[in-house]
Amino acid sequence: MKLKKILLPAALLILAIGALAAYLVRGGFRQFEITPYPVPPPAFTNWNDVLAHPRDISWTTLRTGVIRMDACLNLDPASPRQADCDHAPRDLAALVHWVHHPRFGDFLVDAGFDDSFAKHPPYGNYTEAMQLFNWANGVTNRQEPGEDLAAQLARLHVHPNAVFFTHFHPDHTAGVPALGRETEFVFGKAEASFLARAAVSGHFSGKSKFFSIDFSAAPAMAPLGPSVDVFGDGSFWAISAPGHTDDDIAFLINATTPVLLTGDASHFAWAFQSGVAPRGWNSAGTARGYVSLEQLRAFARAYPSVKIIYGHEAGI
């Protein structure tokens, strides 16, 4: 455990130095031209009413590859429950959720991996800084042929109009190069930070349609935090869940079988059930992560009929 406590700060330093080097060598990261996402008035103002009115919307979860690591490294290092966490390397799924709406068509939540992870294992299309970060933490990635995002979408005959991101970490954005130039990318307003761009900006090369969700004026819908009715019809909700990153988003799909996608507000079931928040960039982020996690846990207790899919564990 002592070695791990040393390695992670060192890896974070490597990531920061790598990001700065890339910034200087490449003349700076291109600035995303970001348009505020047009948020319509909500169809409902409480979750009882939302869930009492399921919508004609469907979802399918896809695994686009596997991340093998000590999953406990993703969690609050100061938590006393770390001693109970199984630190043996395990497989975490790189998940994408395909959602179909009768009016707004097909879209994704997160982008997973493109086929570079099968062609160039174990780091695929990650930046040099992220490859060093993975190596320092003993993280490897793998993918079976045909498991990549583009291959699965082709088999499903799906052409997504947009991707809604839980957050800007590369294991959630590495499938973006496989998507068309006209695809829209939607994320929390604070996600386009320097460090986020350092980790993922290469994935968005040639893309131009960026939209940010601003939760500052969104109503809190107890027991969750600020929540946005994305299409204004009660079918698809973006829920502010910061901590792991500054503007992490969870999503609720209000289908006949409703599902809450926690994103990396909770990476896997043990952490959710044990009340251990994800690690943030700093202690303040981790503290915010506990607030978000407890809101999600309270929602799960209040609405046990809602299926929970974690950031890297879906039971598929």
Residue ranges of model-derived segments:
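Loop/turn elements at helix/coil->beta-strand transitions in domains of secreted/extracellular proteins
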Residues: I57, G105, V158-N161, E182, ...
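Cap/insert and terminal regions of metallo-dependent hydrolase folds
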Residues: A129-A154, T256-I316
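Active-site environment of divalent metal-dependent phosphoester hydrolases
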Residues: D70, F168-A174, S193-F194, T245-I249, ...
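Active-site metal-binding motif and surrounding structural segment of the metallo-beta-lactamase
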Residues: N125-V186
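Active-site beta-strand termini and strand-to-loop segments that position acidic
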Residues: V99-R103, G232-D233, L252-T256
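Active-site neighborhood of phospho(di)ester-bond hydrolases with catalytic His/Asp-centered motifs
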Residues: L108-D110, H159-H167, F187-G188, S240-G243, ...
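Metallo-beta-lactamase
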Residues: L3-V158, G188-S240, V259-G263, A284-S305
